[in-house]
């Protein structure tokens, strides 16, 4: 896996299934020792623990490597080191959002030669809905008065991902600043938060579900939290975002330790806890599992696999849930 939270999540899943002969790796040295000593176990690790592997650790040809979230961290240095360490291993990539681009290509990293499209096996959204593993997604458009210039956002987003000259980067910074001003306009923030609260109280809370509000950036997280606190009890919402918490960090008050964040998320998963809404910008948009989450209020330009992974936070099976709902404020 490529993140600590996924490591914890998968380890818990294996433990719940009572899988024998399993071991979690605590650091890079332990991983290297296990590989070099040819330990025959199911080893769960993050790919980052291959970061110091400079040469072959084990050249056996009956090693199986299963990579979760295989569309990430595979084409760069970490993926190369893992393949160097285990040169003859069979690699299986698991992902809901394979990427096929020049610089990031899941099919190059894992693709099956036996299939024209590079897949070994596919399990679609329709398959998961049929099996009641997930719920369908519904989308709700918001009144156009809350929208901003979507074409400008799309163009700016496209430029961000392209190779830019220094002059182009300067021009983009100016356009992005204008976009941020539009998104953070006090009247717009107030209008969206009013809509969020009204919608939540009418369509989400009565059914026993909870929500997530995805904002443009960390400043927006704070702006929306302050606006929401005027419309609903402060304990009903919480910010979860990346922050160093160091001296001079303007978002230090929102920093949570790993334990505190886990406690907060456990409270969120509890239907009897007053915490009803998480305000985020980049955290909890992948890998976060909370079946009680039914509605995502989306006020951030997103696309491709990032968008797909984010909106799927809402489609987990939960008592009484018929669908996940995405309320889009950018159109």
Regions found by a protein language model. Give the residues of each.
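Conserved helix-turn-beta segment of the N-terminal RecA-like "Helicase ATP-binding" lobe
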Residues: 4-28, 227-234
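Conserved segment of the helicase C-terminal RecA-like domain
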Residues: 307, 313-331
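SF2 helicase motor core recognition
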Residues: 52-55, 279-293, 313-317
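Interdomain helical connector at the RecA1-RecA2 junction of SF1/SF2 helicase-like NTPases
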Residues: 104-208, 225-226, 230
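Inter-Walker segment of RecA-like/P-loop motor cores
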Residues: 14-56
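Conserved helicase ATPase motor motifs in RecA-like P-loop NTPase domains
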Residues: 71-73, 85-102, 132
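Conserved RecA-like ASCE ATPase "motif II neighborhood" in helicase/translocase motors
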Residues: 40-81, 259-265, 280-282
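Conserved C-terminal RecA-like helicase domain
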Residues: 175-280
């Amino acid at each position: 896996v490529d993140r600590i939270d996924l490591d914890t999540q998968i380890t818990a899943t294996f433990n719940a299934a009572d899988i024998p002969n399993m071991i979690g790796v605590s650091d890079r040295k332990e991983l290297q020792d296990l590989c070099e000593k040819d330990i025959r176990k199911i080893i769960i690790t993050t790919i980052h623990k291959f970061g110091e592997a400079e040469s072959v650790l084990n050249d056996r040809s009956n090693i199986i490597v299963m990579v979760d979230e295989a569309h990430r961290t595979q084409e760069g240095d970490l993926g190369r080191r893992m393949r160097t360490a285990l040169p003859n291993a069979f690699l299986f990539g698991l992902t809901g959002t394979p990427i096929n681009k020049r610089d990031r290509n899941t099919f190059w990293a894992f693709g099956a030669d036996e299939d024209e499209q590079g897949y070994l096996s596919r399990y679609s959204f329709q398959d998961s809905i049929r099996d009641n593993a997930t719920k369908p997604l519904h989308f709700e458009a918001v009144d156009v008065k809350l929208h901003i210039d979507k074409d400008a956002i799309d163009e700016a987003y496209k430029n961000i991902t392209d190779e830019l000259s220094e002059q182009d980067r300067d021009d983009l910074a100016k356009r992005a600043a204008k976009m941020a001003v539009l998104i953070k306009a006090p009247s717009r923030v107030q209008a969206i938060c009013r809509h969020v609260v009204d919608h939540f109280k009418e369509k989400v809370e009565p059914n026993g579900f909870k929500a997530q509000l995805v904002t443009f950036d960390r400043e927006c997280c704070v702006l929306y939290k302050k606006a929401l606190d005027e419309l609903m009890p402060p304990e009903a919402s919480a910010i979860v975002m990346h922050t160093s918490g160091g001296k001079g960090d303007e978002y230090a008050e929102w920093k949570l330790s790993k334990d505190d964040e886990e406690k907060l998320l456990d409270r969120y998963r509890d239907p009897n806890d007053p915490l009803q809404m998480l305000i985020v910008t980049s955290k909890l948009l992948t890998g976060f599992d909370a079946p009680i989450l039914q509605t995502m209020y989306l006020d951030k330009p997103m696309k491709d696999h990032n968008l797909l992974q984010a909106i799927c936070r809402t489609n987990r099976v939960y008592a009484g849930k018929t669908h996940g709902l995405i309320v889009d404020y950018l159109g």
